[in-house]
Amino acid sequence: MNTQPHHSSPDSPQDGGWFPISIRLSGARVLLVGGGEIAVNKGRLLLDHGARIDVLAEKLHPAVQGWVENGRVRHVGERADEAVLRRLLPGCRLVYAATDSRDTNRQVAALADELNIPVCAVDDPGPSSFITPAQVRRGMVRVAVSTGGAAPVLARRLREQIETLLPEGTGRLATYMQSRRAFVSGRYPNVQDRKRIWEDFLDGPGAEAARSGDESRADARLEVLLDGERKSGEVWLVGAGPGDPDLLTLKALHLMQNADSVLYDNLVSPALLDMVRRDAELVFVGKQRDRHALPQDEINREMVRRAQGGERVLRLKGGDPFIFGRGGEEIEALVEAGVAFRLVPGISAANGCAAYSGIPLTHRDCAQACLFVTGHAKADGVLDLPWDDMADRRQTVVIYMGISTLPQLAAGLLGKGLPADWPVAIVERGTQPRQRVFTGTLSTIAQQAAEAQVKSPALVIVGQVVRHRVVSP
């Protein structure tokens, strides 16, 4: 068993010149100068945060007009001249200059600044005393991203990336923790004790229960921590997908970034391991066909041992754990040991390799079914496969771990009556940068694979769908 630390390099601090704060707007007056598309975007944000908006504009966008008509916004005037602004500005918490005129926006900003009222001239940080960052919202949780007005498009792109990383239930988790703060404080008056309890709660299964809305389970986990019992561990059996890191599920990524230790094998790419929490212990268990760094029973014991010691153990598997990944055996071992676990499916090798090679697994004209089999031979070298089912011409056969037994596989299918020119494809290192695809027939594919020195991981696809392969120009 090989273990290695997972180090991180510190980021260099950068000063954008803007201090990020949060300001309470519920019930506060905000003057919005402008009634067009720009004003609509800012108005939606302000309304979401409970502001009382006064709009100063000659023409109103239909959305703004709708807000005025239903009483959510007041239309307080049309022209943004100095006299009107001096009458409207006092008492405002914030001012947005959101007209189509840069000169008008700067005039508004100058007057607001003179009265010491925070002002934002939209898309013009020069005269602004504050700017509105791109935001990600999960209930009461807010994440703001700002480039100091230097690159708004970049800020929005970063927001989109954060959206994918932040679990949807984060707002529920925050609400749960808020509702239990007084209870925890009553049990543990010491601030440091409370901090430790909440950190342990966030690191354990209670947080996931709260995210999913299961408050009774979350309460049970919190009570364990309040009683001072040892933090219990858990095993997360996670499918890492076929290789391309972009095919990882959000759930898988969330668990990867919260694990204490990671048990992984050959089918997990280095790019995926780079996405694991930086201080997690990486444990290579090296399962690859009949070569194992650890026997399966020992892998099972290692998962149990670590979880019983309080660790959050990530069992990271290529593809999907329940498709020729021995996930069922590992779950049975966890159940027998009484270890809590979670299952996260992954995009299977069959789905990923087929899509990236342009081969449909089903097709209305020639394949109404798809059969998954393993080409792994038994200890005596015999392939124990449903040959009659595999020879059905109305389906696609996807063969996992079939490269070493490819001559036997081809001969077996020919022996069951499939023609010599029956289409076959091999997808080597599917979905990864060095992917290779070979197409041939039952009579040629074994020789092609040998000449090209095809290595695992590779998937074999048999059927007429291979002739429907499409490649993007």
UniProtKB/Swiss-Prot annotation:
Source taxon at top rank: Bacteria
Catalytic activity field: uroporphyrinogen III + 2 S-adenosyl-L-methionine = precorrin-2 + 2 S-adenosyl-L-homocysteine + H(+); precorrin-2 + NAD(+) = sirohydrochlorin + NADH + 2 H(+); siroheme + 2 H(+) = sirohydrochlorin + Fe(2+)
Species this protein is from: Gluconobacter oxydans (strain 621H)
HAMAP family, alphabetized: Siroheme_synth
Binding site for S-adenosyl-L-methionine: P242, G318, G319, D320, I323, S348, A349, M401, G430
EC number: 2.1.1.107, 1.3.1.76, 4.99.1.4
GO biological process: cobalamin biosynthetic process; methylation; siroheme biosynthetic process
Keywords annotated in UniProt: Cobalamin biosynthesis, Lyase, Methyltransferase, Multifunctional enzyme, NAD, Oxidoreductase, Porphyrin biosynthesis, S-adenosyl-L-methionine, Transferase
Annotated function: Then it catalyzes the NAD-dependent ring dehydrogenation of precorrin-2 to yield sirohydrochlorin. Finally, it catalyzes the ferrochelation of sirohydrochlorin to yield siroheme.
Region (Uroporphyrinogen-III C-methyltransferase): 233-473
SUPFAM superfamilies the record matches: NAD(P)-binding Rossmann-fold domains, Siroheme synthase middle domains-like, Tetrapyrrole methylase
Family indicated by similarity: In the N-terminal section; belongs to the precorrin-2 dehydrogenase / sirohydrochlorin ferrochelatase family.
CDD domains named in the record: SUMT
Protein name stated in the entry: Siroheme synthase
Chain residues that bind NAD(+): E37, I38, E58, K59
Active site: residue positions: D265, K287
Pathway per the UniProt entry: Cofactor biosynthesis; adenosylcobalamin biosynthesis; precorrin-2 from uroporphyrinogen III: step 1/1; Cofactor biosynthesis; adenosylcobalamin biosynthesis; sirohydrochlorin from precorrin-2: step 1/1; Porphyrin-containing compound metabolism; siroheme biosynthesis; precorrin-2 from uroporphyrinogen III: step 1/1; Porphyrin-containing compound metabolism; siroheme biosynthesis; siroheme from sirohydrochlorin: step 1/1
PROSITE patterns: SUMT_1, SUMT_2
